[in-house]
Amino acid sequence: MKAKLAFFLLASCIAVSAQAAKKSSEPAPWMQEPDSFMGIQFDQKFVYSVPECPAGYEIPKEICRRAPYQGLYITMGGPSIGFGYGLSVMAKNGPVDSFYLTTPSENYLHLTQLFITKYGSPTSRSTESVKTKGGGAFTNEILAWKGKKIEIVVEKYTSDINTSSATLRTIASKAKAIQDVDQKINGAASKL
Protein backbone atom coordinates (compact mmCIF):
# COMPACT_ATOMS: atom_id res chain seq x y z
CA MET A 1 0.00 0.00 0.00
CA LYS A 2 2.84 2.39 0.91
CA ALA A 3 4.58 1.54 -2.36
CA LYS A 4 1.44 2.39 -4.36
CA LEU A 5 1.03 5.69 -2.48
CA ALA A 6 4.71 6.57 -3.01
CA PHE A 7 4.44 5.69 -6.72
CA PHE A 8 1.28 7.81 -7.07
CA LEU A 9 2.94 10.81 -5.36
CA LEU A 10 6.05 10.46 -7.53
CA ALA A 11 3.96 10.25 -10.72
CA SER A 12 1.94 13.30 -9.63
CA CYS A 13 5.09 15.33 -8.95
CA ILE A 14 6.55 14.42 -12.35
CA ALA A 15 3.31 15.29 -14.15
CA VAL A 16 3.00 18.65 -12.37
CA SER A 17 6.65 19.57 -13.03
CA ALA A 18 6.34 18.54 -16.71
CA GLN A 19 3.22 20.66 -17.09
CA ALA A 20 4.91 23.63 -15.38
CA ALA A 21 7.94 23.28 -17.65
CA LYS A 22 5.69 23.22 -20.72
CA LYS A 23 3.83 26.35 -19.60
CA SER A 24 7.04 28.29 -18.92
CA SER A 25 8.38 27.57 -22.44
CA GLU A 26 5.24 28.95 -24.11
CA PRO A 27 5.31 32.70 -24.75
CA ALA A 28 3.05 34.75 -22.54
CA PRO A 29 -0.08 36.05 -24.26
CA TRP A 30 0.24 39.55 -25.67
CA MET A 31 -1.91 41.75 -23.45
CA GLN A 32 -1.54 45.06 -25.37
CA GLU A 33 -2.75 43.86 -28.78
CA PRO A 34 -4.11 46.88 -30.70
CA ASP A 35 -7.44 47.24 -32.50
CA SER A 36 -6.29 50.44 -34.23
CA PHE A 37 -3.14 52.25 -35.35
CA MET A 38 -2.74 56.04 -35.42
CA GLY A 39 -6.45 56.39 -34.80
CA ILE A 40 -7.51 54.10 -37.67
CA GLN A 41 -9.47 50.98 -36.70
CA PHE A 42 -8.49 47.65 -38.27
CA ASP A 43 -12.10 46.45 -38.56
CA GLN A 44 -13.65 49.54 -40.20
CA LYS A 45 -13.75 50.31 -43.91
CA PHE A 46 -10.67 52.40 -44.56
CA VAL A 47 -12.23 54.66 -47.21
CA TYR A 48 -14.91 55.74 -44.71
CA SER A 49 -12.43 56.15 -41.84
CA VAL A 50 -9.88 58.40 -43.57
CA PRO A 51 -10.82 61.21 -45.98
CA GLU A 52 -9.19 61.60 -49.38
CA CYS A 53 -6.38 64.18 -49.46
CA PRO A 54 -7.25 67.54 -50.99
CA ALA A 55 -5.96 68.31 -54.47
CA GLY A 56 -2.98 70.64 -54.70
CA TYR A 57 0.26 71.05 -52.83
CA GLU A 58 -1.03 72.15 -49.45
CA ILE A 59 0.17 69.99 -46.55
CA PRO A 60 -2.85 68.32 -44.91
CA LYS A 61 -3.64 69.28 -41.32
CA GLU A 62 -4.97 65.80 -40.47
CA ILE A 63 -4.44 62.31 -41.80
CA CYS A 64 -5.77 61.72 -45.30
CA ARG A 65 -5.33 59.18 -48.09
CA ARG A 66 -4.25 59.43 -51.70
CA ALA A 67 -6.03 57.53 -54.47
CA PRO A 68 -5.31 53.79 -54.15
CA TYR A 69 -3.24 51.55 -56.36
CA GLN A 70 -4.49 47.94 -56.17
CA GLY A 71 -5.74 48.43 -52.62
CA LEU A 72 -2.62 50.27 -51.39
CA TYR A 73 -3.19 53.75 -49.98
CA ILE A 74 -0.44 56.28 -49.21
CA THR A 75 -1.38 58.53 -46.28
CA MET A 76 -0.34 62.09 -45.54
CA GLY A 77 -0.78 64.41 -42.58
CA GLY A 78 -0.46 61.71 -39.93
CA PRO A 79 0.17 62.55 -36.28
CA SER A 80 3.63 63.66 -35.17
CA ILE A 81 5.57 60.85 -33.46
CA GLY A 82 8.90 62.63 -32.93
CA PHE A 83 10.55 61.77 -36.26
CA GLY A 84 9.70 61.68 -39.96
CA TYR A 85 7.92 58.66 -41.39
CA GLY A 86 5.82 57.41 -44.27
CA LEU A 87 2.64 55.42 -43.71
CA SER A 88 0.84 53.27 -46.25
CA VAL A 89 -2.25 51.17 -45.71
CA MET A 90 -3.35 48.02 -47.53
CA ALA A 91 -7.14 47.74 -47.63
CA LYS A 92 -8.17 45.58 -50.59
CA ASN A 93 -11.64 44.53 -49.47
CA GLY A 94 -12.72 47.38 -47.19
CA PRO A 95 -11.23 46.96 -43.72
CA VAL A 96 -7.52 47.49 -43.12
CA ASP A 97 -5.34 44.47 -43.93
CA SER A 98 -2.06 46.10 -42.86
CA PHE A 99 -0.23 49.29 -41.98
CA TYR A 100 3.34 49.82 -43.20
CA LEU A 101 5.38 52.56 -41.54
CA THR A 102 8.85 53.43 -42.87
CA THR A 103 11.49 55.78 -41.48
CA PRO A 104 15.23 56.34 -41.96
CA SER A 105 17.22 53.67 -40.11
CA GLU A 106 18.80 56.27 -37.82
CA ASN A 107 15.33 56.48 -36.19
CA TYR A 108 15.25 52.74 -35.40
CA LEU A 109 15.88 53.11 -31.66
CA HIS A 110 13.13 55.73 -31.36
CA LEU A 111 10.80 53.50 -33.38
CA THR A 112 11.42 50.48 -31.13
CA GLN A 113 11.02 52.60 -27.99
CA LEU A 114 7.64 53.87 -29.24
CA PHE A 115 6.39 50.37 -30.04
CA ILE A 116 7.63 48.84 -26.77
CA THR A 117 6.07 51.70 -24.79
CA LYS A 118 2.74 51.34 -26.60
CA TYR A 119 2.52 47.55 -27.10
CA GLY A 120 4.75 46.09 -24.37
CA SER A 121 7.74 43.79 -24.77
CA PRO A 122 7.88 41.94 -28.10
CA THR A 123 6.85 38.29 -28.10
CA SER A 124 10.05 37.47 -30.03
CA ARG A 125 13.36 39.04 -31.04
CA SER A 126 15.76 37.82 -33.69
CA THR A 127 18.71 38.92 -35.80
CA GLU A 128 19.84 38.05 -39.31
CA SER A 129 22.82 38.97 -41.42
CA VAL A 130 22.16 41.38 -44.30
CA LYS A 131 24.63 41.96 -47.14
CA THR A 132 24.60 44.93 -49.46
CA LYS A 133 25.31 44.81 -53.19
CA GLY A 134 28.61 46.52 -52.41
CA GLY A 135 29.64 43.66 -50.10
CA GLY A 136 29.00 45.30 -46.73
CA ALA A 137 27.49 43.13 -43.99
CA PHE A 138 25.07 44.34 -41.32
CA THR A 139 23.03 42.71 -38.59
CA ASN A 140 19.30 43.23 -39.00
CA GLU A 141 17.26 43.30 -35.80
CA ILE A 142 13.66 42.07 -35.90
CA LEU A 143 11.13 42.58 -33.11
CA ALA A 144 7.77 40.80 -33.36
CA TRP A 145 4.51 40.88 -31.45
CA LYS A 146 1.93 38.20 -32.24
CA GLY A 147 -1.58 38.26 -30.85
CA LYS A 148 -4.86 36.57 -31.61
CA LYS A 149 -5.82 39.01 -34.39
CA ILE A 150 -2.82 41.28 -35.04
CA GLU A 151 0.88 40.75 -35.77
CA ILE A 152 3.52 43.50 -35.61
CA VAL A 153 7.03 43.23 -37.06
CA VAL A 154 9.61 46.01 -36.60
CA GLU A 155 12.81 45.70 -38.66
CA LYS A 156 15.98 47.76 -38.42
CA TYR A 157 16.82 47.26 -42.11
CA THR A 158 13.88 46.64 -44.40
CA SER A 159 14.43 46.99 -48.13
CA ASP A 160 17.86 48.57 -47.71
CA ILE A 161 20.24 49.63 -44.92
CA ASN A 162 18.80 53.15 -44.91
CA THR A 163 15.20 52.18 -44.07
CA SER A 164 13.59 50.82 -40.90
CA SER A 165 9.97 49.70 -40.86
CA ALA A 166 7.04 48.57 -38.79
CA THR A 167 4.32 46.36 -40.26
CA LEU A 168 1.03 45.87 -38.43
CA ARG A 169 -1.02 43.14 -40.08
CA THR A 170 -4.17 41.24 -39.33
CA ILE A 171 -3.65 37.49 -38.94
CA ALA A 172 -6.68 36.92 -41.19
CA SER A 173 -5.17 38.95 -44.06
CA LYS A 174 -1.86 37.12 -43.71
CA ALA A 175 -3.62 33.74 -43.93
CA LYS A 176 -5.61 34.97 -46.96
CA ALA A 177 -2.42 36.16 -48.69
CA ILE A 178 -0.77 32.77 -48.14
CA GLN A 179 -3.87 31.04 -49.51
CA ASP A 180 -3.89 33.31 -52.59
CA VAL A 181 -0.21 32.59 -53.31
CA ASP A 182 -0.78 28.85 -52.92
CA GLN A 183 -3.68 29.02 -55.39
CA LYS A 184 -1.54 30.91 -57.93
CA ILE A 185 1.30 28.41 -57.57
CA ASN A 186 -1.06 25.44 -57.95
CA GLY A 187 -2.67 27.08 -60.98
CA ALA A 188 0.71 27.72 -62.60
CA ALA A 189 1.96 24.22 -61.72
CA SER A 190 -1.08 22.64 -63.37
CA LYS A 191 -0.03 24.26 -66.67
CA LEU A 192 3.35 22.51 -66.68
PLM-predicted stretches and their roles:
Residues 1-6:
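Bacterial N-terminal signal peptides that target proteins for export
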Residues 7-9, 185:
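Composition-driven detection of intrinsically disordered, low-complexity segments
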Residues 11, 80, 90-92, 134-136, ...:
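Sterically constrained small-residue positions within well-ordered secondary structures
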Residues 11-18:
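Hydrophobic h-region of N-terminal signal peptides that target proteins for export
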Residues 21-68, 98-192:
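Non-cytosolic coordination micro-motifs
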Residues 66-93:
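Short, compositionally biased low-complexity segments enriched in polar/charged residues
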